[in-house]
UniProtKB/Swiss-Prot annotation:
Name the UniProt record assigns to this protein: Cyanuric acid amidohydrolase
Metal-binding keyword on record: yes
Cystine pairs: none
Gene Ontology MF, one: cyanuric acid amidohydrolase activity
NCBIfam families hit by this protein: amido_AtzD_TrzD (TIGR02714)
Phylogenetic lineage: Bacteria, Pseudomonadati, Pseudomonadota, Alphaproteobacteria, Hyphomicrobiales
């Protein structure tokens, strides 16, 4: 009986418009129409005015259009602080004449556009929850316990979007565009938690978003940007309907230095395997302390705390895995416990 097979490629980038490495994959045999998603780390500031995300997205849209391919999920996360390396992670899938044997599964979906007045509110949570369920169906994953990472690109509020909403007589959750990034990430993460049965949707209200950090998802990774108005969703997990050498597991870091949990997750994966990708979330602990010691990431008026966190957690993970092309996304509201976050590890078994 046929099955689906996933492929994962980590490609270096010399800039947000450098898609040559991915085009080289196409030249060497990867079918462009088999690509379902591209995750990128671009070298902007990762904040509201980070235009490297949109630049990279447009570069990939142009590339895929040359091959007649449409509908690829293109999710760009800005910020390669510290020694993090700009890169792309390309996810592809194909049907093969091999029985399913429980392997990495990939599913994608997009939600309808989110009205600005719904951003950071309960409506966004419910919209994302439906999108995650759709992506799980696309991946052939029935059990939420088999989901190990849910990557979401969500919108933010710009001055123009705020003005348009208010001109229509509607109110928005905040007038602070930077704060809107956190609200959007947080609501999207809670949507993941609802979809996976980690939280009861009836128990969450607008006031809980980015305030009740005891509510979180074990595997949500959300990144906000001004280059979209909907949500792009990628679900990664394990499914018996898939075959191939790729496997995934994940850890939930309890704080920014919780290397132990990450190492334990790696140990659960096949020993005779090579690292295919590492995907992680990072945030400054809102308590202002890590393991009881004070940090100053939240007190820096020049550099956003999310930028500090990406650099810090990136260094921790680089020390564990020995690579710097790590997908580390900042801002982990409701994505793991406060100050922590999920880390997904994808490996390829040696043949």
């Amino acid at each position: 009986m046929p099955s689906l097979r996933a492929h994962v490629f980590r490609v270096p980038a010399d800039g947000p418009d450098d898609v040559a490495g991915v085009e080289a994959l196409f030249a060497s045999g990867l079918q462009a129409n088999n690509v379902v998603a591209v995750l990128g780390k671009t070298e902007g500031n990762g904040c509201v005015n980070d235009f490297t995300r949109g630049y990279a997205t447009r570069s990939f849209e142009t590339l895929f259009s040359r091959y007649g391919v449409d509908g690829v999920s293109i999710i760009m996360s800005g910020g390669t602080e510290g020694a993090l390396s700009p890169h792309w992670t390309v996810f592809a899938r194909e049907t093969v004449e091999t029985p399913g044997e429980r392997a990495l599964a990939i599913g994608v979906s997009r939600t309808p556009a989110l009205p600005p007045e719904h951003l950071g509110r309960r409506e966004q949570i419910l919209l994302v929850a439906e999108g995650v369920k759709s992506a799980m169906r696309d991946a052939g994953i029935d059990d939420p316990a088999d989901v190990h990472f849910v990557q979401i690109k969500c919108p933010l509020l710009t001055s123009r979007r705020i003005a348009e909403a208010e001109a229509a007589g509607r109110t928005v959750a905040t007038h602070d565009t930077l704060k809107s990034m956190g609200l959007s990430r947080g609501a999207s993460a809670l949507g993941v938690a609802v979809a996976l049965g980690e939280i009861d949707a009836t128990s969450i209200g607008d006031a809980d978003i980015c305030t009740r950090f005891d509510l979180f998802s074990r595997c949500a990774s959300t990144s906000s940007g001004g280059e979209l108005t909907d949500h792009e969703i990628i679900v990664l997990g394990m499914s018996a309907k898939w075959s191939g050498p790729l496997s995934i597991d994940h850890a939930v870091m309890l704080d920014a230095i919780d290397a132990h949990s990450v190492r334990k997750a790696r140990e659960r994966l096949p020993e005779n395997s090579r690292l295919a990708a590492v995907l992680a979330k990072a945030e400054p602990d809102p308590s202002g302390r890590i393991d009881g010691r004070r940090h100053t990431m939240l007190d820096d008026s020049d550099i956003a705390g999310t930028r500090h966190a990406r650099a810090f957690v990136g260094g921790v993970l680089a020390g564990i895995f020995g690579i710097t092309d790590l997908y580390v996304s900042g801002g982990a509201e409701h994505q793991g416990p406060p100050g922590g976050g999920p880390v997904a590890i994808i490996v390829e078994k040696e043949q």
